[in-house]
């Protein structure tokens, strides 16, 4: 199910990222900040359980913690750019990695790395990638995680298009929550999002 997070701060920071005059440091800073804002909104939907602690004046207190492990799984390499912002609010979360490279002719992804923490199969898994373009990388990543037995998976992206959303929903129906900061207009002939952000990986790391 698609959820576009409509928040003024997200819109302003996303404008900074879209600006071609923004260098990699500005791009990266705004990406991290949007990640924190997104995870704050996303986790409204998730359950907590009670946790007993002892306060600094030696009193018992019944507080809260998430009822399941939280795991962020960035799709390399661009997904790494969002991780610091996500972990800022949930430092106890674990992080897995899925490496995908895109064939520039067929636009199909190929997996080259996969490592996920040892956590219960019902953990909250968030696949992270700034861009949801064709959706092929997201579909392959989610399929791989499901093959490993994980069934509580969500997709967190900054910018997406209908084609990518439809591709994910074609494979998984509404079982997957898709969280976007913005739903953009279309893909161009090179399968880049318009108006988009450009190549997110290059803009995060200052490469070309």
Swiss-Prot record:
Pathway: Pyrimidine metabolism; UMP biosynthesis via salvage pathway; UMP from uracil: step 1/1. It catalyses: UMP + diphosphate = 5-phospho-alpha-D-ribose 1-diphosphate + uracil. It is an enzyme of class 2 (transferase). Uracil binds at residues 193, 198-200. 5-phospho-alpha-D-ribose 1-diphosphate binds at residues 77, 102, 129-137, 199. Allosterically activated by GTP. Binds 1 Mg(2+) ion per subunit. The magnesium is bound as Mg-PRPP. Gene3D superfamilies: 3.40.50.2020. It holds the Pfam family UPRTase. The keyword Transferase applies. Its cofactor is Mg(2+). Catalyzes the conversion of uracil and 5-phospho-alpha-D-ribose 1-diphosphate (PRPP) to UMP and diphosphate. HAMAP family: Upp_B. This is Uracil phosphoribosyltransferase. It comes from Mycoplasmopsis agalactiae (strain NCTC 10123 / CIP 59.7 / PG2).
